[in-house]
Amino acid sequence: MRGLEDKRVLVTGGASGIGAATAARFLEEGSAVCVLDRDAAARQRIQRELPNLAGTLDADVSNLQQVESAFANAVRIMGGVDVLINNAGISIRHKFLDITPEEWAKVLAVNLTGVFFVAQTAARHMWQRGSGVILQTASTNGVMGYPFYADYNATKAGVIELTKSMALELAPKVRVCAVAPGYVLTPMQRAEYTDEMLEEVNRKIPLRRHAKPEEIAALFAYLASDDAAYATGHVFMLDGGETAGGLASR
């Protein structure tokens, strides 16, 4: 894709799942890539799998001081950050009536406050430089109701509206978009769903399957490229047709 060669890319939650696939895709496009992830074992694994990474960083995205320190390290390593993939997130499958205050606070701290901390830190850097692209991982959960993920759903709705507001305020210097995947076969998804549950979900998706992380990564690469230079403020659904009919067959 045009314009990705030599871009400097930071991917949060970049050591597994969608983040790892996205890091790999940008490397294929000739970009310099740093990944940020809390999971030490996952960081070691991604370093082995992607030896051309510019660096791996450890930070809790819900801690502003750690975010600022990690971002400064990314700038030091790569000489700047042109593209942020704001992807770090967690989910907990539980009934609404069973959500504890601690669980609620944890999911919001990572999925919304953490997204804000990373986005604001990157935006200040990009605004000063005069250009940049911020792409955030939302979810179809942010636009549709799903049981057992009330806290996660609320955070992803927040990411969608945060993205729109950022795009309006940061234009014309910085483009901001979000990708809202549907069901994606990631380690996080695997940990929460049995094979029977996965098959049941597949029957309700028009394309009859989960997305691959690489398919989400491809959209991130396009949106960061010069081919998408007129795209900002948009949320791109990548869900196999799931939201077209509101998962009508369920």
Predicted regions and their residues:
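Alpha-helical segment proximal to the catalytic Tyr-Lys
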Residues: 124, 167-172, 229
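C-terminal helical subdomain
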Residues: 178, 199-227, 231, 238-240
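Residue(s) in the substrate-gating loop at a strand-loop-helix junction
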Residues: 139
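Short C-terminal tail/terminal secondary-structure segment
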Residues: 144, 232-250
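Active-site helix of classical SDR
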Residues: 119, 155, 163
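Substrate-binding pocket helix/loop in short-chain dehydrogenase/reductase
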Residues: 95-96, 103-105, 201
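Active-site loop immediately N-terminal to the catalytic Tyr-X3-Lys motif
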Residues: 97, 144-150, 208, 226
